């Protein structure tokens, strides 16, 4: 895990809120028409609506979180769904405990 990229991704309050929201997506984001949020993840449009962000800003934020390895993207047709990468988040927490 690249700690610097992870910290940069989490330094933005909206990205941090998105990652926190993905921990309990059913409570944090509006219901979506397709897919199970626990299995498939949360659609970008639901994240956008739940956060009150533009589509382009939401896509950019999710790209940053994805490059940092904190979320996993799954493409289904024209939709992209995101879930937390729990393994990477645990590695980040462990690294904070040992490296800082």
Predicted regions and their residues:
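Short, charged/polar, Gly/Pro-enriched secondary-structure boundary elements
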Residues: 88-92
């Amino acid at each position: 895990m690249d700690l610097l990229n992870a910290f940069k991704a989490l330094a933005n309050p909206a990205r941090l809120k998105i990652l926190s929201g993905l921990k309990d997506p059913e409570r944090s984001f509006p219901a979506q028409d397709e897919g199970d949020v626990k299995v498939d993840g949360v659609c970008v449009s639901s994240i956008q609506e739940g956060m009150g962000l533009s589509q382009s800003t939401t896509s950019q934020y999710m790209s940053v979180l994805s490059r940092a390895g904190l979320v996993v993207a799954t493409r289904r047709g024209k939709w992209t769904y995101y879930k937390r990468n729990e393994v990477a988040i645990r590695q980040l927490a462990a690294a904070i405990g040992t490296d800082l």
